[in-house]
């Protein structure tokens, strides 16, 4: 798991996740009848857990195995999730990294421009590249597709109306 070398402000996320009554098949088919809602801290916690979190652990005499919500080619887990938080949501405004092991947000940057929260999925190619060489980039993209589909389904099932942006606005961020 990724770790930041310095102590940064951390916000533990709620572990009591809100439930949904939407059938999974209806959510995936786009036919679920779910009342629209706004993103709040419990829903954000649910989205992060169901898309990038540790959902189960197994203890062995030689190691502890962590099972993540989204599968990963070869178990390399090259993706990181960041949450851009303007004022609100019960969190300090800023850019936060999701720590899946502790189910917490770590503030790594200042308050973003804009008025809506955003989840940003980034890839760390060397995590797959050292094993899969030139095919490593493909595995990052496959993993991103898996995680994003779970994230969108979890958001849809909660009535959050997510939007996926696949073109990063480099000029706006620079």
Language-model features, listed with the residues they occupy:
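N-terminal accessory segments that position/regulate proteins before the catalytic core
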Residues: 1-174
């Amino acid at each position: 798991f990724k770790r930041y070398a310095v102590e940064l402000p951390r916000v533990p996320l709620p572990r009591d996740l809100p439930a949904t009554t939407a059938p999974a098949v209806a959510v995936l088919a786009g036919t679920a009848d779910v009342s629209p809602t706004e993103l709040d801290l419990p829903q954000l916690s649910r989205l992060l857990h169901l898309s990038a979190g540790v959902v189960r652990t197994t203890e062995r005499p030689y190691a502890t195995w962590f099972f993540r919500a989204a599968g990963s080619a070869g178990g390399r887990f090259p993706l990181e999730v960041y949450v851009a938080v303007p004022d609100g949501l019960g969190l300090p405004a800023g850019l936060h990294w999701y720590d899946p092991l502790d189910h917490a947000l770590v503030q790594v940057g200042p308050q973003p421009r804009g008025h809506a929260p955003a989840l940003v999925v980034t890839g760390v190619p060397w995590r797959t590249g050292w094993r899969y060489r030139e095919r490593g980039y493909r595995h990052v993209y496959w993993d991103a597709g898996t995680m994003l589909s779970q994230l969108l389904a979890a958001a849809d099932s909660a009535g959050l109306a997510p939007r996926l942006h696949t073109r990063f606005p480099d000029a706006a961020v620079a």
